[in-house]
Structures are given as structure tokens and as C-alpha cells.
Amino acid sequence: MKGLFIVFEGITGSGKKTHIKLLAEKLKESGKEVTVLSFPNYESEIARFTKRADLDAYTQSLLFAADRSLYQERIKALLEKGNVILCDRYCYSNFAYQAAKGLPLEWLKEIEKHTIKPDIVFLIDVPVEISMNRVKQLSIEDFTKKEILERLEREKDFLEKIREIYLSLAVTDKETKWFVINGSEDISVNHEKIWKKVKEKLKIE
């Protein structure tokens, strides 16, 4: 029995983690085996290396791709067992963030061409202003929150570019099925939309 591979994408503060948590709970209630993954996985040495300030964008992109490459056999095995994989970011984050820095999108796709493609990508789309407001409301240490908000403020235009690239990928990527979710809407409304699509795919009554 083949499992289902679902990826959630979106800018910081879009609500990916919330929707992954809600969907995981619903799937478990339906008797499904669920595995949650997140990329970059900063527990791996490769991903930690990407935080070095002296790295150029090309090297960083290759390291992010290598981090995902380490997990391909595990993803394959889980899918063969019938698991549902929920992934917080995948290769599309590399495409959007690095292309926004000016790297060629075709090159970014080339270095990730051997990654297992998901069955569904949910793009949780929110305007940058909303993403910043949500970060303000997060229950995290004030210093960490201040640091994130300062970075978001500095990178406002950059985040707008990332958002545009994500929306473009949702239209042009023919290798997998994308669903754009209006992340400005009520969480419970969006959860029901997501659950409806997943139920259809898994043939859950």
C-alpha cells in the first residue's frame, strides 16, 4: 500500500506548523500512520552548516539540497509502508528563497531533480504584513521574537519576492498538485479545506 506525501509551503508566519498539527491529529483519528518531517533539519550537520555567514547562495542551495537528499530513502520506505508524510517545507522553499536572491530557478530545480516529489503541496499564502503580525503574537521569548521581527522588517521586499515565486510555482509546476490556501482566512475554515482534499486523496469517508 502506497502512502501519501504532503508538503506545506509558505513564508514565515503563514501558519504551516498549525495546519500540519491539525492535519496530523485528524489523520491519526482516522487510523493513519503519520510522520512529520521538517526541512532544513538543523539536527543534521549539513543543515547546521548552512547557517554560516560566509556561504554564498549557490553553496547554501547545494547544502539544503544535500540535507533533503539524506532523507530520500527514509521517505521512500515510509511511503512503501503506507505512512502519510507531512512535511514542513521541502525543495520548493529552496526554489523560492534562493531564486528571490537571484539564483536561476532552472538550476535550483536541476540540483533537486532526484528528490521524491510529493503528491500534494499546500501553499499557505499570506501577505507579508499578516505574517509579521502573527510573529508578534507568537508565544516565544521576547528577544527571539524581536530578532525575527527585525529580520522580517529588513527583508520585507525579499519576502514579497518569495511569495510571488511561490505563487508562480503553484501555477507552473506540473510535477505535483498544488493547492493555494488563503492563509488570511480563519484557521478552522482552511483546515476543513485541507482535510477535504486529503480525504479525497486517501478515500476516507
Feature-to-residue mapping (PLM):
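NTP-dependent small-molecule kinase module
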Residues: 24, 132-205
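Pre-Walker A (Motif I) flank of P-loop NTPase domains
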Residues: 2-5
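A glycine- and Lys/Arg-enriched "phosphate-lid" helix/loop adjacent to the NTP-binding pocket
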Residues: 94-164
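Hydrophobic anchor at the beta1->P-loop junction of P-loop NTPases
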Residues: 8
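ATP-dependent small-molecule kinase phosphotransfer cores
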Residues: 32-116
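Conserved lysine of the Walker
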Residues: 16
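Hydrophobic positions on the alpha1 helix immediately C-terminal to the Walker A/P-loop
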Residues: 19
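P-loop (Walker A) phosphate-binding loop of NTP-binding proteins
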Residues: 11
